[in-house]
Design a protein with these regions (language model features):
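A short acidic (Asp/Glu
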Residues: 45-46, 75-79, 131-136, 188-190, ...
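Acidic, glycine-rich loop-and-strand cores that form catalytic or ligand-binding grooves
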Residues: 143-152, 170-176, 197, 201-204
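Active-site neighborhood of phospho(di)ester-bond hydrolases with catalytic His/Asp-centered motifs
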Residues: 35-37, 64-70, 119-125, 177-179, ...
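Conserved beta-sheet core of the metallophosphoesterase superfamily
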Residues: 178-273
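Short, glycine/acidic-enriched loop or turn micro-motifs at the edges of active sites
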Residues: 41, 73, 128, 182, ...
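Active-site neighborhood of divalent metal-dependent phosphoester bond hydrolases
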Residues: 77-164
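Core dinuclear metal-dependent hydrolase active-site scaffold
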Residues: 6-28, 33, 168-197
Length: 281
């Protein structure tokens, strides 16, 4: 899917919250993207980070917001990832409510300003895809659970679902976004020690992915001088996952601002969770 927008260059104007380091940028940009990686709303953990992110969106006024998916952690359906038929209805409802609360706390304050909204895109992640896996293994649950429970259309302009068994891809301003990009015919995510470099060499375009929870960034220059940016965007949750153990220490937690986005090139700004807390908490 490709979004074609006709944006005028806005005048360089300082944001009202001039004390914010990411608001002092005198804008000459074509477009600004805000990337939200893997929020993993979970019933056992609070969603306070959504309040901080809402304040950032109000101050930043991005043109496009891309949620890379896995906002709904859905631990009640984790067994279906392993091909097991395991489901507890009450736990599923709590999982859904956690994700819905995150959505409401994120977009409620932004909409309350009654200002122009950014174009909002949601990419289905593998955790949301657990619903489809559960229905494939237990079709009798049709009507009890469903993708519609996520209520994404209420707050997002475009919802990019899985294409078969692999994440859907959307192109915006020359950047391809997906929850993850596949490494080959088996449909496994591109990963490894240097995943952004792997994305760049395998795909040959500017791409941004989530899924791995780590941060990695690579820029390559084509023979004609154009820049290809490959980004693995980290995650946006502030708790440690019990199952991850020491891998929690490897995660980068925050959001990414892309300024001056044009034809796949941009100026990145990495806004960590700790920075958001210092400014807005």
């Amino acid at each position: 899917m490709s979004l074609k927008r006709n944006l005028k260059n806005p005048k360089g104007k300082q944001n009202r919250s001039g004390n914010l380091y990411f608001s002092k940028h005198w804008s000459l940009h074509i477009s600004t993207h805000l990337v939200i990686p893997d929020p993993h709303a979970h019933p056992d953990h609070n969603n306070d980070r959504a309040d901080l992110l809402a304040k950032l969106i109000i101050d930043l006024k991005p043109d496009v917001v891309i949620n890379l998916g896995d906002q709904f952690d859905l631990p009640s359906l984790s067994g279906y990832d392993k091909g097991k038929r395991s489901f507890v209805g009450r736990s599923y409802r709590a999982d859904i409510d956690a994700g819905l609360e995150f959505t409401d706390r994120l977009w409620g304050p932004v909409k309350a300003t009654k200002k122009r909204l950014p174009h909002r895109i949601y990419l289905e992640g593998n955790h949301e895809h657990r619903i489809e896996k559960a229905l494939d293994l237990s079709p009798e649950m049709e009507g009890t659970i469903g993708f519609k429970d996520l209520d994404l259309d209420r707050h997002y302009d475009d919802v990019i679902k899985y294409d078969g068994s692999t994440p859907g891809v959307v192109e915006v301003d020359g950047i391809y976004y997906a929850h993850f990009f596949i490494s080959g015919v088996m449909g496994r995510p591109i990963s490894g020690e240097h995943p952004a470099y792997s994305l760049s060499t395998k795909l040959g375009s500017s791409v941004t992915a989530g899924h791995l929870h780590t941060l990695d960034y690579n820029v390559r220059t084509s023979v004609e001088g154009s820049k290809r940016h490959s980004l693995v965007a980290g995650c946006f949750f502030d708790y440690n996952s019990d199952w991850a153990g020491k891998a929690n220490d490897l995660y980068w937690r925050g959001v990414i601002v892309k300024r001056n986005v044009e034809n796949g090139s941009y100026d990145p700004e990495f806004v960590s969770m700790s920075q958001l807390e210092k400014i807005y908490a």
